[in-house]
């Protein structure tokens, strides 16, 4: 198109340029956020107990004086993006001075809080998560069924995870942090768990979600089912135990099977196997058993552009890391019915996820 012919086309060119450049440099906002987490900016403001001026913040973070203006410019971007907010305070000379406070988003970065998601930031923006994109062109042209992660590192994600103790710790912390937010979903959807006497949390990690369910419903006997290297050394109690095994071979019997952040790691063929094994695990309950899926359900018709963008970004992450996928309602329906289930119900939870109840 010749953009130089009239003002309308010039305007279109300028808007297209802004759109392009914005997406090119989106990574700067992400990395500035990572820097804020690593520096502990949210912790410093929280611990200060009141709005914090730039000199106070720089002093608390023990920054070199030459970096104060750099901190200001990072904060300017992060404030624009909604992670911090500005207010004014009176200094000793009674002059007003700019100070920073937390916003709902940065409150999610305060260490020690049950809602802290700092480990998610560290995991998602870890060098290993970013460096793999350097071989994306090679990955597209190779005639191999492998993930972008495998193309970049020569091994699959899970093998890498189990060999790198530092990264494994970040991953487990991130999963635990995400699970703690699940407490809100439990409170809002108690009916999902009422009437159950037993539940198995498949690929339940160190048991964060199972513990939340057990706290809310002490009568439910919860089993955390995961790989030996994950649960082998964990100790449970009368109503919370840990079992190791392979979910592609069998799942422990229970009234309900929980699959939280599991099926999006796998393609349809392997997800179908997991669902069929889960169906076998609840077979003793007849029509009263259920499988509870916590995952994303993409709404193609959503008016919330930001929400859909986040869900589609998650889909590409699952693709490049695991050859997994985030699914639309229609894709969930096909997968569920192909596994032999008769009905399902989808309930949006936690902002961008869904709770899917699946019945035999």
UniProtKB/Swiss-Prot annotation:
GO terms for molecular function: 6a-hydroxymaackiain-3-O-methyltransferase activity; O-methyltransferase activity; protein dimerization activity; S-adenosylmethionine-dependent methyltransferase activity. The gene is HMM2. The active site is at 264 (proton acceptor). Belongs to the class I-like SAM-binding methyltransferase superfamily. Cation-independent O-methyltransferase family. COMT subfamily. Induction: Up-regulated by copper. PANTHER family: O-METHYLTRANSFERASE. One of its GO terms (biological process) is methylation. 3-O-methyltransferase involved in the phytoalexin pisatin biosynthesis. Can use (+)-6a-hydroxymaackiain, (+)-maackiain and with a lower activity (+)-medicarpin and 2,7,4'-trihydroxyisoflavanone as substrates, but not (-)-6a-hydroxymaackiain, daidzein, formononetin or isoliquiritigenin. It catalyses: (+)-6a-hydroxymaackiain + S-adenosyl-L-methionine = (+)-pisatin + S-adenosyl-L-homocysteine + H(+). This is (+)-6a-hydroxymaackiain 3-O-methyltransferase 2. S-adenosyl-L-methionine binds at residues 202-205, 226-227, 246-247, 260. Gene3D superfamilies: Vaccinia Virus protein VP39 (3.40.50.150), Winged helix-like DNA-binding domain superfamily/Winged helix DNA-binding domain (1.10.10.10). Keywords: Methyltransferase, S-adenosyl-L-methionine, Transferase. SUPFAM superfamilies: S-adenosyl-L-methionine-dependent methyltransferases, Winged helix' DNA-binding domain. Pfam families: Dimerisation, Methyltransf_2. InterPro entries: COMT-like, O_MeTrfase_dom, Plant_O-MeTrfase_dimerisation, SAM-dependent_MTases_sf, WH-like_DNA-bd_sf, WH_DNA-bd_sf. Its EC number is 2.1.1.270.
């Amino acid at each position: 198109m010749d953009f130089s012919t009239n003002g309308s086309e010039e305007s279109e060119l300028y808007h297209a340029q802004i759109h392009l450049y914005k997406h090119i440099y989106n990574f700067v906002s992400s990395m500035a956020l990572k820097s804020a987490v690593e520096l502990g900016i949210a912790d410093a403001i929280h611990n200060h107990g009141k709005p914090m001026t730039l000199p106070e913040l720089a002093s608390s973070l023990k920054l070199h004086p030459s970096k104060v203006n750099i901190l200001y410019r990072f904060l300017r971007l992060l404030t624009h993006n909604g992670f911090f907010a500005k207010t004014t305070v009176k200094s000793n000379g009674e002059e007003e001075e700019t100070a920073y406070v937390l916003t709902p988003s940065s409150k999610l970065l305060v260490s020690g809080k049950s809602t802290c998601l700092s480990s998610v930031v560290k995991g998602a923006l870890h060098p290993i998560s970013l460096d793999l994109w350097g071989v994306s062109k090679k990955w597209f042209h190779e005639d191999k069924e492998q993930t972008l992660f495998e193309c970049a590192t020569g091994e699959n994600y899970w093998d890498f995870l189990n060999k790198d103790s530092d990264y494994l710790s970040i991953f487990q912390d991130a999963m635990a942090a995400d699970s703690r937010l699940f407490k809100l979903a439990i409170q809002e959807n108690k009916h999902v768990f009422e009437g159950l006497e037993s539940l198995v949390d498949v690929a339940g990690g160190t048991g964060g979600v199972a513990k939340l369910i057990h706290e809310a419903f002490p009568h439910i006997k919860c089993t955390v089912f995961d790989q030996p290297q994950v649960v082998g050394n964990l100790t449970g109690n009368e109503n919370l135990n840990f079992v190791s095994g392979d979910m592609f071979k069998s799942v422990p019997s229970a009234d309900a099977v929980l699959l939280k952040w599991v099926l999006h790691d796998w393609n349809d063929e392997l997800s179908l196997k997991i669902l069929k094994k889960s169906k076998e695990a609840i077979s003793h309950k007849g029509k009263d058993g259920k499988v509870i899926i916590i995952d994303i359900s993409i709404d193609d018709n959503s008016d919330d552009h930001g929400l859909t963008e986040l869900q589609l970004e998650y889909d590409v992450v699952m693709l490049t890391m695991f050859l997994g996928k985030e699914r639309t309602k229609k894709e969930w329906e096909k997968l569920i019915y192909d596994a032999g289930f008769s009905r399902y119900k989808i309930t949006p939870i936690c902002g961008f996820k869904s709770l899917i109840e699946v019945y035999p």
